[in-house]
């Protein structure tokens, strides 16, 4: 009897285990189906809400300008284009509407000074199918004295600009310059700064999260490029040996021409006897200056941290270090 009881109890335990697994499976299936149905309902509600709360009509506006000396714009969310005009300068922008709500651009113009700002009536709606665009057409072959720009979110694309006093601040988006001659400050919180076929003269480029890419561009004076999280990539016709280079990075690769350097946490400096200085800094990212084909990078130089005793000799050794650097880079 005792053996039969033991066998029956064992069989009962197996049945209980099977029933338990089946119950768990059913509960999991019910939970999954309920989540799926709820997700579908939420997705439908979200899509419907976006449709009902989006601008659904637009109007293109244009303001002709006699001359253009300075530009000052402070805009929330839009794309900005600045380019040369084949005629007189003018500004063109898109206003967005839905019922009593509007997302407009407010313009002020006096004595060649143009000011643009966002004018929102009612609550700010979604821009699902309608994106506000502001286009500024510059006088051809004429210099703009200054541009002050503040943009919340959007891309800024600029071509054919000549300006010696830039002050750009973008929260989110990309900024690009092409065929331009610029001086001043350009900063971007989230997004990249791209410079192509242009001239930089005493510029300060900075991002928090985003790359700084300079290609086929002349660096005419002291330039500063800094990012917290992103790459600094420079590809220009000028030789590396024409610059005093001060570089610093925490995590990433540092390449000059076909030479890859390591251990530059304490900085890298080529010398002080050149006419132009290039200051480069990134916390996390690569610094690549006139990098050749990756397959041709054949040397790795380890920069040693100078000892306190050698600090007194740093000035006297700077020229010899610079000569060694020039020898390494004479073909770059």
Predicted regions and their residues:
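A broad, low-specificity signal for short, low-complexity segments enriched in glycine/proline
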Residues: 41-42, 51-54, 69, 75-79, ...
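N-terminal short leaders/motifs
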Residues: 21-25, 60-63, 121-124, 190, ...
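Alpha-helical transmembrane segments and their membrane-interface anchoring/capping motifs
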Residues: 2-85, 143-145, 256-258, 290-292, ...
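Contiguous N-terminal and early-domain "leader" segments and peripheral loops that mark the onset or edge
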Residues: 3-34, 156-158, 170-177, 212, ...
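Right-handed parallel beta-helix
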Residues: 56-70, 79-88, 102-187, 193-199, ...
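Short, surface-exposed interaction patches in beta-rich subdomains
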Residues: 178, 184, 192-332
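Short Gly/aromatic-enriched secondary-structure transition segments
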Residues: 86-96
């Amino acid at each position: 009897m005792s053996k039969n009881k033991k066998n029956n109890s064992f069989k009962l335990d197996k049945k209980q285990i099977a029933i338990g697994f089946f119950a768990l499976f059913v509960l999991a299936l019910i939970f999954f189906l309920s989540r799926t149905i709820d997700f579908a309902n939420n997705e439908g509600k979200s899509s419907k809400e976006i449709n009902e709360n989006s601008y659904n009509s637009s109007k293109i506006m244009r303001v002709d300008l006699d001359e253009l000396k300075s530009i000052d714009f402070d805009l929330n969310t839009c794309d900005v284009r600045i380019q040369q005009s084949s005629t007189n300068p003018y500004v063109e922008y898109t206003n967005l509407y839905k019922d009593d709500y509007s997302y407009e651009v407010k313009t002020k113009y006096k004595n060649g000074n143009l000011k643009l700002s966002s004018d929102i009536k009612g609550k700010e709606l979604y821009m699902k199918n309608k994106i506000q665009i502001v286009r500024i057409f510059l006088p051809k072959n004429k210099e703009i004295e200054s541009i002050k720009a503040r943009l919340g979110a959007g891309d800024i694309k600029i071509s054919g600009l000549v300006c010696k006093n830039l002050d750009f601040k973008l929260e989110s988006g990309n900024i690009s310059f092409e065929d331009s001659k610029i001086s001043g400050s350009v900063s971007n919180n989230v997004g990249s700064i791209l410079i192509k076929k242009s001239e930089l003269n005493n510029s300060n480029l900075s991002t928090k999260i985003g790359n700084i890419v300079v290609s086929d561009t002349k660096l005419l004076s002291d330039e500063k490029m800094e990012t917290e999280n992103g790459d600094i990539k420079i590809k220009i016709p000028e030789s590396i040996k024409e610059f005093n280079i001060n570089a610093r990075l925490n995590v990433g690769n540092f390449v000059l021409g076909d030479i890859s350097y390591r251990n530059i946490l304490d900085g890298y400096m080529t010398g002080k006897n050149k006419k132009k200085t290039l200051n480069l800094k990134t916390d996390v990212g690569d610094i690549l200056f006139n990098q050749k084909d990756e397959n041709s990078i054949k040397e790795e130089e380890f920069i040693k941290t100078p000892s306190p005793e050698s600090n007194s000799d740093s000035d006297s050794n700077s020229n010899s270090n610079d000569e060694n650097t020039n020898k390494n880079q004479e073909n770059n």
